[in-house]
A protein has these predicted regions:
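N-terminal helical cap/lid subdomain that shapes the substrate entry/recognition surface
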Residues: 1-81
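Arginine residue identity/basic-tract feature
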Residues: 2, 33, 37, 46-51, ...
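Short, well-ordered coil loops that connect the C-terminus of an alpha-helix to the N-terminus
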Residues: 10, 58, 93, 149-150
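A short alpha-helix capping/helix-coil boundary motif
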Residues: 26-30, 64-68, 86-88, 119-121, ...
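Catalytic-core regions built around general acid/base machinery
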Residues: 83-94
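Asp-based, Mg2+/Mn2+-dependent phosphohydrolase catalytic module
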Residues: 89, 100-204
Length: 204
Protein backbone atom coordinates (compact mmCIF):
# COMPACT_ATOMS: atom_id res chain seq x y z
CA UNK A 1 0.00 0.00 0.00
CA UNK A 2 2.93 2.33 0.61
CA UNK A 3 3.45 2.58 -3.15
CA UNK A 4 -0.02 4.01 -3.74
CA UNK A 5 0.04 6.12 -0.58
CA UNK A 6 3.22 7.87 -1.68
CA UNK A 7 2.02 8.10 -5.30
CA UNK A 8 -0.89 10.19 -4.00
CA UNK A 9 1.53 12.28 -1.93
CA UNK A 10 -0.39 11.57 1.26
CA UNK A 11 2.74 11.15 3.37
CA UNK A 12 2.91 14.96 3.44
CA UNK A 13 -0.38 14.97 5.37
CA UNK A 14 0.20 11.98 7.64
CA UNK A 15 3.16 9.60 8.10
CA UNK A 16 2.49 6.26 6.45
CA UNK A 17 2.93 4.24 9.65
CA UNK A 18 0.37 6.41 11.44
CA UNK A 19 -2.09 5.92 8.61
CA UNK A 20 -1.64 2.14 8.65
CA UNK A 21 -2.30 2.14 12.39
CA UNK A 22 -5.72 3.65 11.59
CA UNK A 23 -6.41 1.62 8.48
CA UNK A 24 -5.74 -1.91 9.75
CA UNK A 25 -8.43 -2.04 12.47
CA UNK A 26 -10.92 -0.26 10.20
CA UNK A 27 -10.30 -2.74 7.40
CA UNK A 28 -10.52 -5.76 9.68
CA UNK A 29 -13.73 -4.52 11.29
CA UNK A 30 -15.38 -3.89 7.92
CA UNK A 31 -14.35 -7.28 6.56
CA UNK A 32 -15.84 -8.95 9.64
CA UNK A 33 -19.10 -7.13 9.03
CA UNK A 34 -18.98 -8.19 5.39
CA UNK A 35 -18.39 -11.83 6.35
CA UNK A 36 -21.65 -11.67 8.28
CA UNK A 37 -23.53 -9.96 5.45
CA UNK A 38 -23.99 -6.73 7.39
CA UNK A 39 -22.46 -4.61 4.63
CA UNK A 40 -21.80 -4.98 0.91
CA UNK A 41 -18.41 -5.25 -0.73
CA UNK A 42 -19.03 -1.90 -2.37
CA UNK A 43 -19.56 -0.28 1.03
CA UNK A 44 -16.43 -1.96 2.39
CA UNK A 45 -14.27 -0.70 -0.48
CA UNK A 46 -15.58 2.83 -0.17
CA UNK A 47 -15.61 3.10 3.60
CA UNK A 48 -12.31 1.53 4.68
CA UNK A 49 -10.24 4.32 3.18
CA UNK A 50 -12.72 7.15 3.63
CA UNK A 51 -12.94 6.42 7.35
CA UNK A 52 -9.19 6.04 7.76
CA UNK A 53 -8.43 9.23 5.85
CA UNK A 54 -10.90 11.13 8.00
CA UNK A 55 -9.44 9.81 11.25
CA UNK A 56 -5.93 10.77 10.16
CA UNK A 57 -6.93 14.22 8.92
CA UNK A 58 -6.03 13.32 5.34
CA UNK A 59 -7.71 15.08 2.43
CA UNK A 60 -8.26 12.66 -0.45
CA UNK A 61 -10.95 13.64 -2.91
CA UNK A 62 -11.69 10.13 -4.16
CA UNK A 63 -11.20 7.32 -1.59
CA UNK A 64 -12.87 4.83 -3.93
CA UNK A 65 -10.32 5.57 -6.67
CA UNK A 66 -7.56 5.14 -4.09
CA UNK A 67 -9.03 1.74 -3.24
CA UNK A 68 -9.10 0.80 -6.93
CA UNK A 69 -5.48 1.84 -7.44
CA UNK A 70 -4.46 -0.05 -4.30
CA UNK A 71 -6.13 -3.26 -5.45
CA UNK A 72 -4.67 -2.95 -8.94
CA UNK A 73 -1.22 -2.56 -7.40
CA UNK A 74 -1.65 -5.64 -5.21
CA UNK A 75 -2.18 -7.95 -8.16
CA UNK A 76 1.09 -6.84 -9.77
CA UNK A 77 3.23 -7.65 -6.74
CA UNK A 78 5.05 -10.97 -6.83
CA UNK A 79 4.66 -11.51 -3.10
CA UNK A 80 3.35 -14.51 -1.20
CA UNK A 81 3.25 -15.40 2.47
CA UNK A 82 6.46 -17.05 3.67
CA UNK A 83 6.23 -20.80 3.31
CA UNK A 84 3.23 -20.77 0.97
CA UNK A 85 4.96 -22.26 -2.11
CA UNK A 86 6.59 -24.99 -0.01
CA UNK A 87 3.32 -25.90 1.68
CA UNK A 88 1.34 -25.90 -1.56
CA UNK A 89 3.91 -28.11 -3.28
CA UNK A 90 3.58 -30.56 -0.39
CA UNK A 91 -0.21 -30.45 -0.36
CA UNK A 92 -0.57 -31.15 -4.07
CA UNK A 93 1.19 -34.47 -3.48
CA UNK A 94 -1.58 -35.40 -1.05
CA UNK A 95 -4.54 -34.32 -3.16
CA UNK A 96 -6.14 -31.42 -5.01
CA UNK A 97 -5.86 -27.95 -3.48
CA UNK A 98 -8.66 -25.42 -3.84
CA UNK A 99 -9.18 -21.83 -2.74
CA UNK A 100 -12.38 -20.73 -1.00
CA UNK A 101 -12.48 -16.96 -0.67
CA UNK A 102 -14.70 -14.03 0.25
CA UNK A 103 -12.33 -11.81 -1.71
CA UNK A 104 -12.96 -9.65 -4.74
CA UNK A 105 -13.81 -11.84 -7.72
CA UNK A 106 -11.91 -9.73 -10.26
CA UNK A 107 -8.68 -9.98 -8.28
CA UNK A 108 -8.31 -13.46 -6.80
CA UNK A 109 -7.08 -15.36 -9.85
CA UNK A 110 -4.75 -12.50 -10.76
CA UNK A 111 -3.24 -12.50 -7.27
CA UNK A 112 -2.59 -16.24 -7.44
CA UNK A 113 -0.94 -15.86 -10.83
CA UNK A 114 1.23 -12.87 -9.91
CA UNK A 115 2.39 -14.74 -6.81
CA UNK A 116 3.36 -17.73 -8.95
CA UNK A 117 1.18 -20.15 -7.00
CA UNK A 118 -1.74 -20.56 -9.40
CA UNK A 119 -0.14 -23.77 -10.71
CA UNK A 120 -0.93 -25.44 -7.39
CA UNK A 121 -4.63 -24.55 -7.37
CA UNK A 122 -7.20 -26.86 -8.93
CA UNK A 123 -10.30 -24.75 -8.38
CA UNK A 124 -11.03 -21.22 -7.17
CA UNK A 125 -14.40 -20.90 -5.42
CA UNK A 126 -15.66 -17.45 -4.50
CA UNK A 127 -18.44 -16.22 -2.28
CA UNK A 128 -19.64 -14.17 -5.24
CA UNK A 129 -20.49 -17.44 -7.02
CA UNK A 130 -23.60 -17.90 -4.87
CA UNK A 131 -23.76 -14.56 -3.06
CA UNK A 132 -23.04 -16.20 0.30
CA UNK A 133 -19.96 -15.48 2.42
CA UNK A 134 -17.89 -17.44 4.90
CA UNK A 135 -18.64 -18.34 7.68
CA UNK A 136 -22.09 -19.25 6.30
CA UNK A 137 -22.24 -23.04 6.06
CA UNK A 138 -23.97 -22.86 2.70
CA UNK A 139 -20.75 -21.67 1.05
CA UNK A 140 -18.76 -24.56 2.51
CA UNK A 141 -21.39 -27.07 1.38
CA UNK A 142 -21.39 -25.46 -2.06
CA UNK A 143 -17.60 -25.75 -2.23
CA UNK A 144 -17.74 -29.48 -1.52
CA UNK A 145 -20.34 -29.93 -4.25
CA UNK A 146 -18.07 -28.13 -6.71
CA UNK A 147 -15.03 -30.29 -6.01
CA UNK A 148 -16.74 -33.57 -5.19
CA UNK A 149 -15.36 -33.59 -1.66
CA UNK A 150 -16.62 -34.70 1.72
CA UNK A 151 -16.28 -32.98 5.11
CA UNK A 152 -14.37 -35.95 6.50
CA UNK A 153 -11.64 -35.71 3.86
CA UNK A 154 -11.41 -31.93 3.59
CA UNK A 155 -9.09 -29.60 5.51
CA UNK A 156 -9.53 -25.83 5.67
CA UNK A 157 -6.32 -23.86 6.18
CA UNK A 158 -7.24 -20.28 7.01
CA UNK A 159 -5.97 -17.15 8.73
CA UNK A 160 -9.36 -15.75 9.72
CA UNK A 161 -10.64 -17.58 12.77
CA UNK A 162 -14.23 -16.43 12.42
CA UNK A 163 -14.75 -16.82 8.68
CA UNK A 164 -12.43 -19.75 7.95
CA UNK A 165 -12.09 -21.86 11.07
CA UNK A 166 -15.48 -21.48 12.74
CA UNK A 167 -17.20 -21.66 9.37
CA UNK A 168 -15.40 -24.83 8.29
CA UNK A 169 -15.78 -26.42 11.72
CA UNK A 170 -19.51 -25.83 11.61
CA UNK A 171 -19.59 -27.54 8.21
CA UNK A 172 -17.80 -30.58 9.62
CA UNK A 173 -14.42 -29.97 8.01
CA UNK A 174 -11.01 -30.47 9.58
CA UNK A 175 -9.35 -27.11 10.27
CA UNK A 176 -5.89 -25.58 10.57
CA UNK A 177 -5.67 -22.04 11.90
CA UNK A 178 -2.78 -20.04 10.50
CA UNK A 179 -2.50 -17.57 13.37
CA UNK A 180 -0.24 -15.16 11.53
CA UNK A 181 -1.18 -12.23 13.81
CA UNK A 182 -0.80 -14.20 17.05
CA UNK A 183 -4.42 -13.57 17.98
CA UNK A 184 -5.27 -14.59 21.55
CA UNK A 185 -8.41 -16.74 21.56
CA UNK A 186 -10.59 -17.65 24.52
CA UNK A 187 -11.50 -20.91 22.81
CA UNK A 188 -10.02 -22.58 19.75
CA UNK A 189 -11.83 -25.30 17.81
CA UNK A 190 -9.07 -25.74 15.22
CA UNK A 191 -7.46 -29.16 14.92
CA UNK A 192 -4.09 -27.45 14.59
CA UNK A 193 -2.86 -23.90 15.12
CA UNK A 194 0.40 -22.65 13.61
CA UNK A 195 2.18 -19.35 13.22
CA UNK A 196 4.25 -20.54 10.23
CA UNK A 197 2.84 -22.26 7.18
CA UNK A 198 5.75 -24.68 6.95
CA UNK A 199 4.77 -26.10 10.36
CA UNK A 200 1.75 -27.64 8.66
CA UNK A 201 3.93 -29.89 6.50
CA UNK A 202 4.95 -32.06 9.44
CA UNK A 203 1.31 -32.50 10.46
CA UNK A 204 -0.16 -33.48 7.08
Amino acid sequence: MRIVYEKYGLQDQCPYDDFIACYMPNNESLWTRHHHREITKEYLKRERFRRSFEQCGIVCNDPLQFDYDYLETIVTLKQVVDGAPELLAHLTKRGPVHVLSNGFANLQSRKLKSGGIDKYITKLILSDDIDVTKPDRRLFDYALEQVGGTPETTVMIGDNYDADILGANNAGWHTIFFNRKNVVLETNVADLTVTRLTDIIAWL
